[in-house]
Amino acid sequence: MSNLKYAIVTGYSSGIGKAIVSTLELNNFQVLTLTTRLNDTVALEKEVKSLLKEYDIDLLVNCAGLGIFTPHEEISISKIKELIDINLTAPIILTNLMLRSLKKTKGHIINISSIEATKHSKFSALYSATKSGLRDFGLCLFEELRKSGVGVTTINPDLTKTNFFDDLQFEPSTKEDTYLVPQTIAYTVIDILNTKGVITDITIRPQKFEIKRK
């Protein structure tokens, strides 16, 4: 199709990212996959630059993320670096690499942050720092890019039923009104892209709050 658009979505293999990819593909997008580890910045830059020689990017969705909720002194230095690299550094670098292409297409950047970027919770200092950093990056970047026609949106989902919780000490309750599902976030992405004007920041929450300890 002549009006096919091109998107790059990180974290595409599971959870919210996988739902976003499936939904984009039903809405006239071809999703280009990155195979490089996001914390390997040298290889990542090489792969992105290779893709940009073939495609003009219409949409970048920074969705990949890791979580840890534990007393800060118990977190290893390597885990601190890994969370910062995946949750914050990689989206900033990918945006930097793709911005000229996005300006050309007057495209859109969507950052999947977290409800934790909007509040302060115990045992969440590291995770919240990375996600609030991503949120502020997006909000500032929108102001920078307004004249270019590039939209920037941050989505802050609350508890979403995905494998994100596999290695954590808690998970969403089994009650359906206490968690979101990935498809809700994916539909929100489409709504954002179809909105006249720019939704710069949106928080999505279930009606009730309840978690289950493992």
Question: Which residues fall in each region the model found?
Answer:
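Residue(s) in the substrate-gating loop at a strand-loop-helix junction
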Residues: 114
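Active-site helix of classical SDR
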Residues: 95, 130
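Alpha-helical segment proximal to the catalytic Tyr-Lys
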Residues: 100, 139, 143-147
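Conserved NAD(P)H cofactor-binding loop of Rossmann-fold oxidoreductase domains
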Residues: 63-69
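N-terminal Rossmann NAD(P)H-binding glycine-rich loop of SDR-like oxidoreductase domains
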Residues: 13, 21
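Substrate-binding pocket helix/loop in short-chain dehydrogenase/reductase
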Residues: 71-72, 79-84
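C-terminal helical subdomain
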Residues: 154-155, 172-213
